[in-house]
Curated annotation (Swiss-Prot):
Similarity comment text for this entry: Belongs to the PEPCase type 1 family.
UniProt-recorded Gene Ontology molecular function terms: magnesium ion binding; phosphoenolpyruvate carboxylase activity
Gene: ppc
Keywords: Carbon dioxide fixation, Lyase, Magnesium
SUPFAM superfamilies membership: Phosphoenolpyruvate/pyruvate domain
The protein, known as: Phosphoenolpyruvate carboxylase
Alphabetical list of InterPro entries matching this protein: PEP_COase (IPR021135), PEP_COase_bac/pln-type (IPR022805), PEP_COase_Lys_AS (IPR018129), PEPCASE_His_AS (IPR033129), Pyrv/PenolPyrv_kinase-like_dom (IPR015813)
Catalytic reaction annotation: oxaloacetate + phosphate = phosphoenolpyruvate + hydrogencarbonate
GO biological process: carbon fixation; oxaloacetate metabolic process; tricarboxylic acid cycle
Active site: 138, 546
Enzyme class per UniProt: lyase
Gene3D superfamilies tied to this protein: Phosphoenolpyruvate/pyruvate domain (1.20.1440.90)
Cofactor field: Mg(2+)
EC numbers on record: 4.1.1.31
Length: 883
């Protein structure tokens, strides 16, 4: 066993042992024995022992209803502990991320070694770094917040136990604390009883900021500064903070009727309240630290006679008073009280920055740089990264809601029906109104509740302090009028600045038309004047993959980006591409470094803006050290992509991708849309319907309550297939298309694409990862337990397809087995399979019992239902991504 993994294995086995003792104390020896038997059978089954595999199935089928929950919980909790150990391993000196902050050093050394790059060019690239991470409340974070806190503490214990020099009594204390934490987790219900509200989701986002990002961001900037000094002799300017955080929690109303204008207003206030709370703690530290007397004449002039004795403290105490007054006012507003704004209310970042920066400059000038560069510097950087709003909010709404609102308005005004007008007529009307000085909305108009909601949301944007709302994203954008309509509604609300409005192109057709839409918009003089040389466009990954399959979608995304980059470059517009990717492969997820380097050349010139979703937020930003690691990876990748962009693909490669795209899309849609057996098979072979019972996010799982696959959101669609281990959306169509191109004699060309074109090699790498997580015998077992025999041939057909796909991918990549070049991930999947397999078998059994009871008109047994929910959460932990 590789040395690197032995530390991980020993931690996993130690945590497993403690969990075993906890189970024994709580439920007795016999349950622990039952769990141990199942674990050993699973291990042996994985090693290829068919007799033990059969015994595993029989044992799990024969569990009594009383045994179901303890067994499901044992394996589910074990997987959470294994994930925690793995997370620690990724930041421990013995593990992976001994190397991650090194990413920056490695990248800088690589760039310095390129003869065509001067140090000045590299510095300029660093200065133009821009990374905006958009936290979204996707319902994929299955783990309850209370358990996440316990796992963070388990992580801290593992860190201290790694210290060889601790005394025996300290080691014993730490082991006792670990036992307490694992016992607390065991006796906590891991399934939420109620769906979180949008405000709960926003609070979850603030908790990530407080527990991890608040410390992680300044630490990352220190690391970046150190590497730049060492490699380029260059110091980061104090005001330079290339990373920002935005949130969709409380702002994303697309398909979520629970997010209203009032909710957004509340979340904006709550976010500002949390910012004052966190900055107050920082300022309190600075009040006690900055006791120095010597100051520059400028600082002494600023504080006057009153503050001359302790000028720095004087300024900090003043700032503290303003923060306290601001917090009290926000608290009253949150309780619904209407109060006049107090004097000194903090609404802009400059008001926080100026007194802090004045102290910084004075300390530097008086030879106290070592003090200036301590906590004060960290706070200054937090002002730049988080500031008064803490996290900015994006507003997202579906395009048809704006069209319907304008339709209702034009009908009321008696000037026709906007909804039925041609695109040219819509544009003419919108541009006329955008240029007009008179208001369009009549004062006494009483619109419908839906339209009122759209108008109220625009009102909230107009009232919010400038800078607290980052962008207005239009989902399902199809035409230039979709973008102009939002600008008109914002103008009518009285917004006094050019709010960034980003169309989101998310189906195959919309991606293919994206460049035409943006070209038309950029040809409108009024629009060019408004945007002042900057444009944001969002690329949807999940809906396009659900619409056309992963191969066709990824090529459409690439081509749309490529065309938009060239169009904007020609027009002299700085384009920011906003990537709406999920954590799972079927929703565009890929390891960050590979994903960024596989984008078209020039795609990161306007910075990187990307969604971080659900459980990925915890995996990538759950601890300050992991935050440093993740931000370092992004930084290295952006620098490399901008300074050493991937080559333009050859024309012949583009033609092959066009071909792969058509073949794979036809096959994918042939099954998903046209095969009459597909939807009944999907509904019975996966826990799709049961997933709806999980109180995950505040957003309904379907856009429309009735309807087939097309009405399902992308997340439950992926989630369901991940549960039964067929992982279908992440590969269906791709391998068949590759096979067809190989049969046409183009294998050597595909191999060259794999070697020399990051876009293509990343695609294949992602397919390999999906195949490594998929499991055909388990998928077959779900069929046998749950699916009508008439549909078995379809299941067999799909499994055969996957087997063929694996062969062709390995042949093109020249690999003997899956994940050959990422042994760390392969090891991690193997480690978890032993614990995930029993949960899969058990889930199929539970679905069988639950559906059987329903068929017989009985109420489902609550023990079965609860155990089922636990298996869903456990498998999600085992797969390390849900949707």
């Amino acid at each position: 066993m590789n040395e690197q993994y032995s530390a991980l294995r020993s931690n996993v086995s130690m945590l497993g042992k403690v969990l075993g003792e906890t189970i024994k104390d709580a439920l007795g020896e016999h349950i622990l024995e039952r769990v141990e038997t199942i674990r050993k059978l699973s291990k042996s089954s994985r090693a290829g022992n068919d007799a033990n595999r059969q015994e595993l199935l029989t044992t799990l089928q024969n569990l009594s209803n009383d045994e179901l929950l303890p067994v499901a919980r044992a394996f589910s909790q074990f997987l959470n502990l294994a994930n925690t150990a793995e997370q620690y391993h990724s930041i421990s000196p013995k593990g992976e991320a001994a190397s991650n902050p090194e990413v920056i050093a490695r990248t800088l050394r690589k760039l310095k070694n390129q003869p065509e790059l001067s140090e000045d060019t590299i510095k300029k690239a660093v200065e133009s770094l821009s990374l905006e991470l958009v936290l979204t409340a996707h319902p994929t974070e299955i783990t309850r917040r209370t358990l996440i806190h316990k796992m963070v503490e388990v992580n801290a214990c593992l860190k201290q136990l790694d210290n060889k020099d601790i005394a025996d009594y300290e080691r014993n204390q730490l082991m006792r604390r670990l036992r307490q934490l694992i016992a607390q987790s065991w006796h906590t219900d891991e399934i939420r009883k109620l769906r979180p509200s949008p405000v709960d989701e926003a609070k979850w986002g603030f908790a990530v900021v407080e527990n991890s990002l608040w410390q992680g961001v300044p630490n990352y900037l220190r690391e970046l500064n150190e590497q730049l000094e060492e490699n380029l002799g260059y110091k980061l300017p104090v005001e330079f903070v290339p990373v920002r955080f935005t949130s969709w929690m409380g702002g994303d109303r697309d398909g979520n009727p629970n997010v209203t204008a009032d909710i957004t207003r509340h979340v904006l206030l709550l976010s500002r309240w949390k910012a004052t709370d966190l900055f107050l703690k920082d300022i309190q530290v600075l009040v006690s630290e900055l006791s120095m007397v010597e100051a520059t004449p400028e600082l002494l002039a600023l504080v006057g006679e009153e503050g001359a004795a302790e000028p720095y403290r004087y300024l900090m105490k003043n700032l503290r008073s303003r923060l306290m007054a601001t917090q009290a006012w926000l608290e009253a507003r949150l309780k619904g009280e209407e109060l006049p704004k107090p004097e000194g209310l903090l609404t802009q970042n400059e008001e926080l920055w100026e007194p802090l920066y004045a102290c910084y400059q004075s300390l530097q000038a008086c030879g106290m740089g070592i003090i200036a560069n301590g906590d004060l510097l960290d706070t200054l950087r937090r002002v730049k990264c988080f500031g008064v709003p803490l996290v900015r909010i994006d507003i997202r709404q579906e395009s048809t809601r704006h069209t319907e609102a304008l339709g209702e308005l034009t009908r009321y005004l008696g000037i026709g029906d906007y909804e039925s007008w041609s695109e040219a007529d819509k544009q003419a009307f919108l541009i006329r109104e955008l240029n007009s000085k008179r208001p369009l909305l009549p004062r006494n108009w009483q619109p419908s509740a839906e339209t009122r909601e759209v108008l109220d949301t625009c009102q909230v944007i107009a009232e919010a302090p400038q800078g607290s709302i980052a962008a207005y994203v239009i989902s399902m954008a199809k035409t230039p009028s979709d973008v102009l309509a939002v600008h008109l509604l914002l103008k009518e609300a009285g917004i006094g600045f050019a709010m960034p409005v980003a169309p989101l192109f998310e189906t195959l057709d919309d991606l293919n038309n994206a460049n035409d839409v943006m070209t038309q918009l950029l040809n409108i003089d009024w629009y060019r004047g408004l945007i002042q040389g900057k444009q944001m466009v969002m690329i949807g990954y999940s809906d396009s993959a659900k619409d056309a399959g992963v191969m066709a979608a990824s090529w459409a995304q690439y081509q749309a980006q490529d065309a938009l980059i060239k169009t904007c470059e020609k027009a002299g517009i700085e384009l920011t591409l906003f990537h709406g990717r999920g954590g799972s492969i079927g929703r565009g997820g890929a390891p960050a470094h590979a994903a960024l380097l596989s984008q078209p050349p020039g795609s990161l010139k306007g910075g990187l803006r990307v969604t971080e979703q659900g459980e990925m937020i915890r995996f990538k930003y759950g601890l300050p050290e992991i935050t440093v690691s993740s931000l370092s990876l992004y930084t290295g990748a952006i620098l490399e992509a901008n300074l050493l962009p991937p080559p333009e693909p050859k024309e012949s490669w583009r033609r092959i991708m066009d071909e792969l795209s058509v073949i794979s899309c036809d096959l994918y849609r042939g099954y998903v849309r046209e095969n009459k057996d597909f939807v009944p098979y999907f509904r019975s072979a996966t826990p799709e319907q049961e997933l709806g019972k999980l109180p995950l996010g505040s957003r309904p799982a379907k856009r429309r309550p009735t309807g087939g696959v097309e009405s399902l959101r992308a997340i439950p669609w992926i989630f369901a297939w991940t549960q039964n281990r067929l992982m279908l959306p992440a590969w269906l169509g791709a391998g068949t298309a590759l096979q067809k191109v190989v049969e046409d004699g183009k294998q050597s060309e595909l191999e060259a694409m794999c070697r020399d074109w990051p876009f293509f090699s990343t695609r294949l790498g992602m397919l390999e990862m999906v195949f490594a997580k998929a499991d055909l015998w388990l998928a077959e077992y779900y069929d046998q337990r749950l699916v009508d025999k008439a549909l078995w041939p379809l299941g067999k057909e799909l499994r055969n397809l996957q087997e063929e796909d694996i062969k062709v991918v390995l042949a093109i990549a020249n690999d003997s087995h899956l994940m050959a070049d990422l042994p760390w991930i392969a090891e991690s999947i193997q480690l978890r399979n032993i614990y995930t397999d029993p949960l899969n078998v058990l889930q199929a059994e539970l679905l069988h019992r639950s559906r059987q009871a329903e068929k017989e008109g009985q109420e489902p047994d609550p023990r079965v239902e609860q155990a089922l929910m636990v298996t869903i959460a456990g498998i999600a932990a085992g797969m390390r991504n849900t949707g």
